[in-house]
Amino acid sequence: MAQGQVQVYFTTTSPDIQLPEEKQQLLVPTNVRRYGLSQILNSEAMLDTSSPIPFDFLINGTFLRTTLDEYLTANGLSSETTLNLQYVRSLIPPLYEASFEHDDWVSSVDVYSGSSAVGIWGSSSVEAGQERILSGSYDGLLRVWNKSGQAIATSAPASAGGHTSGVKSAKFLSTKQIASAGLDRTIRIWNYSEAEDHFSAQLKPTLELYGHTGSIDSIAVHGPSNRILSASADGQIGFWTSHKSSAPEVNASLISGPSAKRRKITTSTSTPQRGPLSLMDCHNGPATAVIFNPEDSTVAYSASQDHTIKTLDITTSSIVDTRTLLNPILSLCALPGIGHQIIAAGTTARHIALIDPRASAATTQAMTLRGHTNFVSSIFADPDSNYGLVSAGHDGTCRVWDLRSTRQGTKDEGLGVVGEAIYIIERESRKDKTTKPVGGEGVKVFDVNWDKDVGIVSAGEDKMVQVNKGRGVTRPEI
């Protein structure tokens, strides 16, 4: 039986691999897949490349993962249809670069570079090689690392004004300020200063913020306004300032107790203590994550083990919208989306739900990303693309996703659109082990960050910060 054919129209947004107009339309076999199409494009009659370039192909904004015939059948199209194939260079895997060892589990990472939020907020540029990685650990300490893996600064211990228990979240607030929070229910503000040679630095505690009655598991910062958001196991969302003069007096009852007394006895310095600008009773269970709306710093989103995502008006300390999912939520990230913002929510059910936060949205969940085999603990947007993100899970992996790499969900998955990871990043600390940890035991990943200049930075139970170079993974050129 003769093999079917279909007319295709090749397009690209990359001028250096643009076909001449007379070659853009072609009749190709319907049994061809991505690899075959890539061979056709590289051929002498088409692009005539000196060495083969691997290509991926999109039809209506989604990657082609089947034969053209299977695509036509799945979409109810006939072979008389002309298919528009947008071609791009194939995705680049994130390569391992380095690991930075700690004394205890690493709960949090942040990056300071010319392209990071702090770098963009700041007035001075960051020279190549002067990027910094901030880590927070269960040993109660913060560390600032250079890209060579040297810890150029370590925070003070509890006896000198540091955290009295494990750190759960730490962020660069500016080039000279860091905020951290953790199991001791406090947020601490640190002055950060580097020596002229940039080989050493100091972290000096300058402010302690009290208000929560449970551990603080997540903070978000907005440098231009010096504002901080916190999510606590007490179910509340806190709103704070890093300016001592603008912060309210602290509730004295919140700083009493054995740990506070012990610190006052042993420390030789006294750090000012202040309270929150507001505390919002948002959730009926532990609040696990909070973020600023990247487009409007007066709006925030919070998540909880009570299955809800709340949209918050920070100015009025009010809840303006509630979205309820089927499972407890552990992590949040705002994605630019395609035309409008999307919220990615990592759940205890091992998947990531993509939520349209607009009140006018017809459905709560726009897409589901499946692949993790344990809790999804952290999510970060691809800095190079509107379509990409990376997630960290308790299964011991980070997974890179492209929202154009999708399929139709099965009945067991609740139907709908399902995304699958395009790359899986394992922990390098397990590479020499012969047995795979069950459920990520010993290598759970707690946090992940994706920076244009530094790469994908992750932290976990293996006491390591791991760096994988990830720029261009999801191809922003499309």
Swiss-Prot record:
Top-rank taxon: Eukaryota
WD repeat feature ranges: 115-155, 162-200, 211-250, 282-322, 371-411, 440-478
Disulfide bonds: none
Location of region: Ubiquitin-like (UBL) domain: 6-89
Entry keywords, A to Z: Nucleus, Repeat, Ribosome biogenesis, rRNA processing, WD repeat
Presence of the UniProt keyword rRNA processing in the record: yes
Annotated transmembrane regions: none
PANTHER family hit by this protein: RIBOSOME BIOGENESIS PROTEIN WDR12, WD40 REPEAT PROTEIN 12, 37
Subunit structure: Component of the NOP7 complex, composed of erb1, nop7 and ytm1. The complex is held together by erb1, which interacts with nop7 via its N-terminal domain and with ytm1 via a high-affinity interaction between the seven-bladed beta-propeller domains of the 2 proteins. The NOP7 complex associates with the 66S pre-ribosome. Interacts (via UBL domain) with mdn1 (via VWFA/MIDAS domain).
Protein name: Ribosome biogenesis protein ytm1
Gene name of the encoded protein: ytm1
